[in-house]
Design a protein with these regions (language model features):
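Active-site and NAD+-binding cores of ADP-ribose-processing enzymes
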Residues: 9, 65-183
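Extended catalytic/binding region for NAD+/ADP-ribose chemistry, centered on the ART fold
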Residues: 27-53
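Short, flexible loop/turn elements at secondary-structure junctions
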Residues: 7-13, 39-44, 70-75
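A general structural signal for short secondary-structure junctions and capping/turn motifs
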Residues: 28-31, 57-60, 148-149, 158
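ADP-ribose/NAD+-binding catalytic cleft of ART/PARP-like enzymes
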Residues: 1-32
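Cytochrome P450 catalytic domain signature, combining two hallmark sequence patches
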Residues: 25-26, 54-66
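Extracellular structured ligand-interaction cores
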Residues: 4, 34-36, 64-68
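Charged/polar, solvent-exposed surface patches and flexible loops
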Residues: 16-20, 48-52, 89-96
Length: 183
């Protein structure tokens, strides 16, 4: 059984709704790991996300919120793309469907083609194999304090449904790991 404690950064009013009604799936055609309910492995990443959301003009007057969840599924329903063999398996399963006739053109074109392709590939693979939780550590380059580029990663989880969330609670932004929210 796969069980993991994960974090979701959002706005306070949305956190209240989530705790009452459950999460809504993110369904944009450019989602990083396909459609799903998104979580970060690291609390600090979820806090950064929540604080960025608050700074958006459309969210003026809102407050950040941090949710901690325990997600779960059977081992064979969890797929970790950090494992190179799993990534190769996903690519080889999807690749035959990317060719349009004899012309060899990708089915998806346009400015967000690669993002849409990744989303579509993840959705296809999850559906094909009954995957309920998909994980990947997205790399990015960041300069350290003295200017050296360093590769860091941000692990994310896309969970199919609220049924895969077995515990949920709100934590205080900036609080300690096991601190409850002050609200």
């Amino acid at each position: 059984m796969f069980i993991e404690t994960v974090y979701h950064g959002t706005l306070k009013h949305k956190a209240n709704r989530i705790q009452r009604e459950g999460f809504m799936q993110s369904e944009k055609e450019t989602e990083w790991l396909g459609t799903g309910i998104y979580f970060f492995a690291q609390r600090k990443d979820a806090e950064v996300w929540a604080n960025r959301e608050v700074r958006k003009v459309k969210n003026q007057g809102s407050y950040p919120a941090l949710l901690e969840a325990v997600i779960s599924c059977e081992d064979d329903k969890f797929f970790d793309l950090d494992i190179s063999a799993n990534m190769e398996q996903l690519v080889s399963a999807v690749k035959p469907y990317l060719i349009n006739g004899n012309n060899g053109h990708a089915v998806i074109d346009g400015p967000d083609a690669k993002l849409k392709l990744r989303c579509l590939a993840c959705n296809f693979y999850k559906k094909l194999h009954g995957i309920q939780v998909l994980a990947y550590s997205f790399p990015r380059i960041k300069n350290n304090d003295i200017g050296f580029p360093v590769c860091v990663s941000q692990r994310q989880y896309a969970v199919n449904t609220n049924k895969n969330i077995i515990e949920l609670r709100e934590l205080a932004i900036g609080g300690k790991q096991h601190e409850k929210s002050g609200s």
